[in-house]
Regions:
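Boundary at the C-terminal end of the N-terminal hydrophobic targeting segment
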Residues: 21-23
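A contiguous binding-surface segment within folded domains or other stable secondary-structure elements
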Residues: 239-293
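Alpha-helical, coiled-coil/dimerization segments enriched in small aliphatic residues
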Residues: 220-246
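Extracytoplasmic substrate-binding proteins
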Residues: 32-36, 41, 51, 136-215, ...
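Bacterial N-terminal signal peptides
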Residues: 9-18
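Bacterial N-terminal signal peptides that target proteins for export
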Residues: 1-8
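A short, structured surface patch at a secondary-structure boundary
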Residues: 63-121, 125-133, 232-235, 243
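Structural recognition of the beta-strand scaffold that forms the well-ordered cores
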Residues: 62-64, 82-85, 125-129, 149-153, ...
Length: 367
């Protein structure tokens, strides 16, 4: 099956001028459905290299990292979440897919686990982000009460896919996880094939704004990895940045020296902030009005905790190298992606809202 997908991807690449092609047509079959797979014991390895053994696939999930709630939903088990973090309740498509999410308890905030709330939720497994799992005081709470926990972390796309597949085993939905990672790998292959002949000195120089105008990507992160896969030169990667915890910031003088040709931003309104700020006026991307908001669906595409990174790769490559991707119907690709992996049927209006980063995340005080 994998070989067959590869051959069809190659055919798509050769038929660049075929009308209305879409990048994932061979991977997209239908929405994730089906029952929990496997009844016996299972063993997985998490991001910290810990081995977790369960007697059977879990049925009650505490998702103390928003990414893991997205994965559980992707695997068709969103209704089995019993505890979440606040950020998951902001995502409108998650609200649509998991209608009861607003009533779920929030047993962790700011990396601190409120064990009484978590115990009342009675999870079979607790999914943690690495920062929380690194705090011994927090994991001791879980160990004291015998709660199994899994660290969902990654620094690049391969590690992210491995984490998703391990979670697929925990959820009893390994086949669904493999369907998603197969699509992910196929998209990387497609885009790399189409951009591989562009000389390094002719690749578009891109700056990626993360939440704030001057927050950006460092080397050794998944953002550095996926922007490389999109065929661009990410100007901040490998250069000196100011670190604040796990966040990285560029100085304005450095951005002017980099002089990116394209800027992509993942926070609504930051594109206009950059375009209107006189300090950015000398940047080529600003002068040529090539400052674009990144689409937002289940989450911000290409954000560290995003499951839409395959779409972010395609969208970015198509935005900066339109002639190489003119045959791909991006709107259809988006509809098929969300239908297969989240069982969502998107209207044309919803697709445009995703592409324009409009109204897809709910303000916390609006609930």
């Amino acid at each position: 099956m994998k070989h067959r997908r590869y051959l069809i991807w190659m055919l798509i690449f050769l038929l660049l001028h075929a009308p209305a092609a879409h990048a994932g047509q061979t991977a997209v079959t239908g929405p994730v459905t089906g029952s929990v797979q496997g009844e016996g014991p299972l063993t997985v390895t998490d991001f910290f290299g810990r081995t977790l053994t369960l007697e059977r696939p879990a049925n009650r999930f505490a998702c103390l990292y928003a990414f893991t709630g997205h994965v559980v939903t992707l695997l068709g088990r969103g209704k089995d979440m019993v505890a979440v973090v606040d950020g998951l309740k902001k995502d409108r498509l998650i609200q649509q897919r998991v209608p009861g999410i607003q009533s779920l308890p929030i047993p962790a905030k700011g990396g601190v686990i409120h064990i009484e709330t978590l115990l009342k939720a009675d999870p079979d497994v607790v999914f943690l982000k690495p920062e929380t799992a690194a705090a011994e005081a927090e994991t001791r709470k879980l160990e004291r009460f015998g709660l199994p926990w899994f660290v969902a972390g990654y620094r690049n796309m391969d590690e992210q896919m491995t984490t998703i597949e391990m979670m697929g085993k925990i959820c009893g939905r390994y086949d669904a996880a493999r369907a998603y990672t197969g699509y992910y790998r196929d998209m990387i292959h497609l885009v790399k094939q189409r951009t591989r002949k562009i000389p390094e000195d002719q690749r578009v120089r891109l700056y990626h704004s993360v939440n704030e105008a001057r927050r950006t990507d460092a080397a050794g992160t998944i953002e550095a990895d996926w922007t490389r896969a999109a065929g661009v030169v990410n100007v901040s990667v490998g250069n000196r940045l100011s670190a604040r915890g796990d966040k990285f910031f560029a100085g304005m003088e450095q951005i002017l020296i980099w002089n990116p040709e394209v800027i992509i931003v993942n926070e609504a309104g930051v594109d206009q902030q950059i375009l209107q700020d006189k300090k950015w006026a000398a940047v080529t991307a600003v002068q040529e009005k090539k400052v674009f908001p990144i689409p937002v669906g289940i989450s911000r595409w290409g954000h560290p905790g995003s499951l839409e990174t395959p779409l972010a790769i395609l969208w970015t490559a198509r935005k900066v190298y339109p002639a190489l991707f003119s045959d791909i119907d991006l709107e259809m690709e988006i509809k098929q992606f969300y239908h297969q992996f989240f069982d969502l049927v998107l209207t044309d209006e919803m697709v445009q809202n995703i592409l324009n980063n409009e109204g897809m995340r709910q303000a916390m005080d609006a609930r």
